[in-house]
């Protein structure tokens, strides 16, 4: 009750200050208007019109006096100080926003005022609009912007950052600045969230946050991914330290492995960490979150300590674990586990697909943000907590021609691990059995008139048909369905797009100009280049058969063979072998078979 009264008082105080500013502006404008010559001339003319007898006689005299007064004012104006222009209240607020550095194009993302470490800032930047708060101007910036939430990471209190040691008695000014931000947010009805992603001074958790989340922001797949990883990785295992305290036993195990020559240490900065993981075959860590990031980059992880997680036992994300206790120092379990993981090599393509699917669906940064923001109450008129997931929405387009094709399409869509936002079909297919089945399942559906359903030479719809369907799609992505691809079809292509930032994803095909170039040069260099990437996934290529593309790109109606000439980034991702076969529990993982 006390916080609610404080919130209402703060809102009334802010409204009163705004009204006073507007009143002062109106009074200044009124005074300037009453003192203007134009108004006095108008009054003289009005008085003369009301009393024509006397008014017309006095009008020349009154106008002459105004003229003399105006001339005297202009002559003496040079020796007097010019009056300051009347400043608008809206102009004052726009100037404050400009000085705060927060002028920019608005978008559909949530607006978050952040006290964040550089790593957390880079992780959430693609999914929310971050307005960074600094200790020296936190109050000015926060008062000049409208935000949906306040997000504070404990890692921002690390040494060397702007908010270093916030919450510590030695940094009372920074703690007071952050406390003011949290209380001001509460007075507006804006939730404030603390991410306990690193050890922090205890006073930080005592601030009146709306929510304290134990953990980080998940795995940012746009940073930790296997995109363009070299086929040949370093074979020597590498140890990456965690942010928190590893423990005495874990540190001694690492020291023993390094002393025996089985392990090398690496301590890259947060910016170089993804490249280090992509270049490694085996990674030794003591943090489960770091193990997930290593496996998302294609490396095999050995986790020191931690209890098995039953939720990830069947997803390929169960790394080999070594218990961290006193017996591990004398049993040699760490060396044996490292030898097994090292012998297994990096993750296979099937294992990597399973890992990326699991991370994409459960622990990627947009999923974690939606979960965290969904646990607080937003102020009326704010954005949706699930706004970070909008960039994943996909519209599935297809051109079924008969009942057999439509039933195959319906079966493929209904078993997808990641449900589409909508389905876009040409008009006149409502009578097909598969379309009726999709409607009965409650999937949103759109139909488009005038779609050319004639197939091209390869038996698939042409670019004009896909473009007509994409023009009616409302999602940022369009999936082009041609044949059944399995339950993980949408998950795989959307995950690849999120990892790479590509404009289109699909199997690599020979570039349309490679044959001509080869015949002209006589050396087949272009054809050799196509063959080099034909069997590789998660690499950028010259041409693909698109399975997923940005809606704006498909709407242009271009042949996919020339998309790269128009600036599109094309990522190769072939179909997963045995897509319809369900993985057996424990079949794929980071622990090799004992036999």
Please name every model-derived segment.
Residues 467-490:
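Short beta-strand-to-loop acidic/aromatic patch adjacent to the donor-nucleotide binding site
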Residues 1-90:
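Boundary detector for helix-to-coil junctions that initiate low-complexity/charged tails
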Residues 272-274, 345, 351-354, 528, ...:
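C-terminal catalytic/acceptor-binding lobe
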């Amino acid at each position: 009750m006390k916080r609610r009264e404080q919130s209402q008082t703060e809102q009334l105080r802010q409204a009163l200050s705004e009204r006073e500013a507007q009143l002062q502006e109106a009074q200044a404008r009124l005074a300037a208007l009453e003192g203007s010559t134009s108004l006095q001339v108008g009054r003289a003319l009005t008085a003369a019109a009301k009393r024509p007898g006397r008014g017309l006689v006095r009008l020349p005299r009154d106008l002459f006096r105004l003229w003399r007064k105006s001339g005297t004012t202009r002559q003496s104006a040079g020796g007097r100080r010019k009056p300051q222009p009347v400043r608008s209240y809206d102009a004052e607020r726009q100037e404050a926003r400009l000085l705060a550095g927060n002028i920019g194009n608005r978008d559909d993302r949530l607006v978050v005022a952040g006290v964040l470490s550089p790593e957390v800032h880079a992780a959430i930047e693609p999914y929310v609009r971050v307005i960074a708060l600094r200790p020296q101007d936190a109050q000015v910036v926060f008062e000049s912007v409208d935000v949906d939430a306040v997000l504070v990471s404990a890692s921002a209190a690390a040494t060397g950052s702007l908010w270093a040691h916030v919450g510590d008695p030695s940094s009372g000014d920074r703690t007071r600045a952050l406390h003011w931000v949290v209380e001001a947010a509460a007075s507006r009805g804006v939730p404030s969230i603390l991410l306990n992603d690193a050890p922090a001074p205890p006073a930080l958790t005592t601030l009146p946050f709306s929510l304290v989340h134990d953990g980080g922001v998940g795995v940012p797949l746009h940073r930790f991914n296997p995109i363009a990883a070299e086929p040949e990785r370093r074979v020597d295992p590498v140890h990456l330290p965690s942010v928190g305290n590893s423990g005495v036993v874990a540190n001694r195990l690492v020291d023993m492995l390094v002393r025996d020559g089985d392990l090398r240490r690496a301590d890259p900065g947060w910016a170089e960490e993804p490249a280090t993981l992509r270049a490694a075959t085996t990674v030794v860590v003591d943090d489960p979150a770091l193990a997930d990031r290593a496996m998302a980059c294609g490396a095999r992880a050995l986790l020191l300590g931690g209890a098995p997680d039953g939720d990830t036992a069947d997803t390929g994300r169960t790394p080999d674990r070594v218990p961290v206790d006193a017996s591990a120092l004398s049993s040699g379990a760490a060396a044996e586990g490292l030898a097994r993981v090292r012998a297994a090599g990096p993750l296979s393509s099937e294992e990597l697909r399973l890992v990326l699917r699991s991370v994409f669906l459960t622990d990627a940064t947009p999923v974690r943000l939606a979960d965290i923001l969904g646990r607080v109450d937003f102020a009326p008129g704010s954005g949706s907590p699930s706004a970070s997931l909008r960039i994943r929405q996909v519209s599935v387009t297809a051109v079924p021609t008969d009942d057999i094709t439509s039933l195959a399409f319906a079966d493929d869509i209904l078993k997808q691990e990641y449900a589409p936002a909508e389905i876009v079909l040409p008009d006149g297919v409502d009578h097909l059995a598969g379309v009726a089945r999709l409607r009965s399942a409650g999937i949103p559906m759109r139909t488009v008139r005038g779609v050319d359903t004639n197939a091209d030479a390869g038996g698939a719809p042409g670019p004009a048909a896909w473009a007509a369907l994409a023009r009616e799609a409302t999602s940022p992505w369009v999936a082009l369905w041609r044949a059944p691809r399995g339950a993980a079809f949408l998950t795989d292509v959307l995950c690849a797009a999120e990892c790479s930032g590509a404009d289109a994803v699909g199997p690599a095909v020979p570039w349309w100009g490679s044959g001509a170039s080869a015949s002209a040069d006589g050396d087949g260099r272009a054809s050799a280049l196509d063959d080099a990437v034909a069997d590789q996934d998660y690499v950028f290529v010259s041409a693909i058969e698109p399975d997923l593309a940005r809606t704006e790109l498909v709407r242009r109606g271009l042949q996919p063979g020339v998309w790269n000439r128009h600036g599109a980034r094309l990522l190769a991702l072939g179909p997963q072998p045995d897509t319809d076969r369900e993985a057996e529990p424990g079949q794929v993982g980071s622990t090799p078979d004992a036999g």
